[in-house]
Amino acid sequence: EDDIIVVGAGMAGICTAAAAAEKGASVTLFSASSQPISRGGSNFSAYNKVVEEYGIDRLDPVDFFYHEERAASFTIDQKMWMRGYNNSEEAMNWCIDIVRSKDVEVFLESDNRLDNGPDYAIGFGAKGDDTASASTGQQNAVEAMEAYALEQGATIIYDTVAKQLVRDEETGRVTAVVAQKADGSYVKFVGHKGIVLATGDFSANKEMIAKYCPQILPIVGLEDAETDYNRGFALTGL
């Protein structure tokens, strides 16, 4: 039992665990993978100290946000988008300071250009690494954030697969997660203040793909394949 339970050890989950532990919460993160996982790159914020160091002007969000919202027929949560715009700079600067303290280079990706959006996205690399393309150094960042989360007192457990959410019958709030360990036994993680699901999309879930996007099931090759929770980002596609 802890204040916060985080499910998933990607960049989102690791950063959540680190931030909560930094603020004094008791945190347990568990993941189906056997290590922190990065399957992408292109870390975006509305502005940040690295962009400022390069002398790039602050993004005017109007055209960019309008284009992105229109692409989704304006069915998105616009309040959430604006929260991202208003708070992403603070969050990214926090992350940049941490990974730099762990000897990770922070740079702007060379292959990220949008017609009516920002010409920058944050990438990461090992010291001396001159590669600045999307995703190539993301593992450096997630491992640095994992180290910081542990330093702040977070507990991280791997090879543990979430199986069922437990909801409060009166409020409907998710209060716990039942998971299966590598030895086949089950464990219940109770979060008194919150449960954070940071497990990514359902591109590796055969049942959900079959229901919501059956036409791609043969293409992604999941018909008879076992899920590999440790698979990293594939440059040829997921």
Locate each region found by the language model.
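N-terminal Rossmann-like FAD-binding beta1-loop-alpha1 element of flavoenzymes
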Residues: 2-28
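Short acidic, glycine/serine/threonine-rich loops at helix termini
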Residues: 38-42, 170-172, 201, 206-210
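Generic hydrophobic/aromatic pocket-lining and core-packing "Φ" positions
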Residues: 14-17, 92, 235
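Conserved redox-cofactor binding core of oxidoreductases
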Residues: 84-186, 206-207
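Glycine-rich loop(s) and the adjacent beta-strand/alpha-helix scaffold that form part
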Residues: 182-185, 189-238
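Fold-independent oxyanion-binding glycine-rich loops
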Residues: 9, 31-33, 159-161, 179-182, ...
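Conserved N-terminal glycine-rich FAD pyrophosphate-binding loop of Rossmann-like flavoproteins
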Residues: 33-57
